[in-house]
Amino acid sequence: MHENMFFARTQQLSILEKRIRDLKDGYRQNIAIVGDEHVGKTSIIFKFLQQFCDNRIIPVYIEVRNETLACLCKRFIAVLLYNFLLNSEMPLKEDLEFLITKSSFYIPQTIEKIKALLHTLSKKKKDSVFTELLSLAESIHDETGKHCVIIFDEFHNLETTGVKKIFTEWAKILIVQKSTLYIIISSLKHKARGILSKDLSLLFGNFEIITIEPFDIKTSQDYLTSSLQSVTIHDALKNFIVNFTGGCPLYLTVISEMLTRSPQVSLVNILEELLFDSSGLLFQNFSNYVNRFQGSASKNEQLAILFMIADGHNKIKDIAHLLRKTKKELSSSINALLESDTITQSGDFLKTTDRVLGFWLKFVYQERLNSLTFDAKNQKALFRLKIDSLIQEFIATTKRPVSERMMELLHLFQDDQIQIERKKLRLNHFREVKFVEFKNCNLTDGLLCRSEDSIWVIAFKYDALTEEDIGEFAKECKKFRHKLQQKIIITFQDVDANSRLKALQEKIWTWDINNVNHVLDLFSKQRITVAQTALSAEPLRI
């Protein structure tokens, strides 16, 4: 983990701090932090623990691994006792027997329970061991008045300990434990939400879910500005990095660190080292990831689907056609990819969760598979050419007006269905898309789209959207006198609550830049970046 990877996330830290204060005041609200790999979930916890200081709270951070119950219990007890003794001013050792001996002077009853638990483990018994382990936190509270904050990182791995119905057992403890706060973390969003909605869905002791997303465009740009202060780099290349990484903190960090270490090295060279060279950090990471999909016919089918999506064939019906199978025959493999959070689904479309993985699959992994001789020199030159072409295409695209790019996108719609913020939307096949001007409205320019049975009216708002804007746009839409309308305002700034409510009342969609980029992703088009209208003028060195 990179120390400087932590950036922003102040809202999430504030929630954690508030929940700690609430715990001391007698109100316990457990927390579940979920998000894709590499988005910085653990870094939020580490930052919180780093700045946390309260003698009345004992933090217990446990990274849950694929290990036996005995190993988990011993690590848990060691961390619990070590952090309990941390403020005692005595020299400490990471030795379980030492920690038990020293703690026995302060919490004798808890130590007796620990010894009994370890004895049970030595007999290779598992019944009730996990619940006894978690009850140690309440025992310490009874003896000292101190609260424990137990953090299970990748908590879904608790299933590998061999305890039957471990989450059901845990739920029973959660109901009665009032003095212990649990924070659980998971990179498997689909699986975690399943556990939370089923086994850990409780009236008392339930979990507040905090979803960690990649950085948005502005935060990504702010991160690069902060981390590349000593590097002279064109704004267009910064925006390309934001687009390429999808705002993933790990990728932003790795690329910015390499640019800082070697400011004279081009971005193409850096991406080549990371993604193409066999010793590259991301090459090895993605190679290990792809190895999960080898060894059986079903795994091979999942990998074939992943290749299709990375290559731009991301409609389910198109994948079925190319693989010569029915959608029903592919459903189990698609569901497996969805459940592992390798891909996401939006209506009739699929896309890779990790943008950089998708690029690597298309331009590195598949190229190596399809090469008859694998001429390393030729493959490297081809890779560099594709990276360079991708950068040039991005820069050229971002210079075009947003309205023009949206018109191009709308012409690609073919009556497929997508999902935007949990709402389904049919992408009508338009026979006509044209520019319009709203003369009596602050939303001066827009698009009018006609299909066989409906019209879409789209307006663009480049500064803050107001309730007045929405009211005027609603009046403009009425001029078209068509019953079946989709009214959409595309805005490039945050929409305040009042404006959003007004839009709901007028049945107007408000799409922010994330919504638009979501649709662009589904059609393999370059994303829109906030700073695209203000690119710097220094010479561009790729």
Task: For the regions a language model picked out, list residue spans one by one.
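A short, conserved structural fragment
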Residues: 338-348
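A short helix-turn-beta junction within AAA+ P-loop NTPase domains corresponding to the substrate/partner-engaging
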Residues: 196-214
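Conserved small helical "lid"/interfacial subdomain of P-loop NTPases
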Residues: 208-237, 243-244, 255
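Short amphipathic alpha-helical interaction segments
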Residues: 323-340
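Sensor-1/coupling segment of RecA-like P-loop NTPase cores
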Residues: 34-35, 142-151, 157-162, 170-199
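Winged-helix-like regulatory helical subdomains adjacent to P-loop NTPase cores
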Residues: 253-327, 374-375, 379-382
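P-loop NTPase nucleotide-binding core
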Residues: 28-149, 158, 180
